[in-house]
């Protein structure tokens, strides 16, 4: 399956930014994170309970990897991921932060969303804390550099994209309306 335009950029930046990392935070793979999203009603705050949940997530992750491709797992993960500010899933995140559909995201916009997946609170581009907003910009630039190293964008394109500020069209989604 070959995607074109920004859909390809999203897929490629996510693959580079997430799949090629050994974990997605807390020592878990993307498959394990998806298992936790899909099948854990409430993540235990108690360490002992959490230790009991982890093996179940591992078993589910192995089953996910048996039945789905990496791309399908990644799609499910992005469709369930909480990008903060009522933006659950890549479609809502694209709309919330940039006012567009995922297929219309620019490379630097997709890179910012991918960067948030590592730790949305630390890389929240609309945080009141200016340091956290700086973190979001820095993380976006790391994802762009990873895309350049993987050959998805040129060095010159990476440099020009990294020079851009975070241009948001932020609109908080109210699901109660």
Model-derived features with residue positions:
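Non-catalytic, structured segments within soluble enzyme domains
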Residues: 26-177
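Active-site-adjacent loops and short helices of periplasmic peptidoglycan-processing enzymes
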Residues: 15-20, 102
């Amino acid at each position: 399956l070959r995607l074109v335009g920004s859909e390809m950029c999203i897929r490629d930046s996510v693959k580079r930014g997430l799949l090629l990392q050994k974990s997605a935070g807390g020592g878990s793979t993307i498959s394990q994170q998806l298992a936790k999203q899909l099948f854990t009603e409430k993540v235990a705050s108690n360490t002992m309970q959490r230790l009991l949940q982890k093996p179940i997530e591992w078993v589910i992750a192995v089953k996910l990897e048996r039945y789905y491709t990496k791309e399908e797992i990644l799609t499910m993960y992005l469709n369930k991921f909480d990008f903060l500010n009522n933006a659950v899933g890549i479609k809502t995140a694209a709309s919330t932060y940039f006012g567009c559909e995922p297929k219309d995201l620019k490379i630097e916009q997709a890179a910012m969303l991918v960067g948030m997946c590592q730790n949305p609170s630390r890389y929240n581009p609309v945080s009141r804390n200016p340091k956290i907003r700086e973190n979001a910009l820095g993380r976006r630039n790391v994802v762009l550099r990873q895309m350049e190293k993987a050959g998805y964008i040129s060095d010159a394109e990476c440099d020009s994209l990294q020079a851009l500020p975070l241009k948001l069209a932020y609109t908080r989604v109210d699901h109660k309306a």
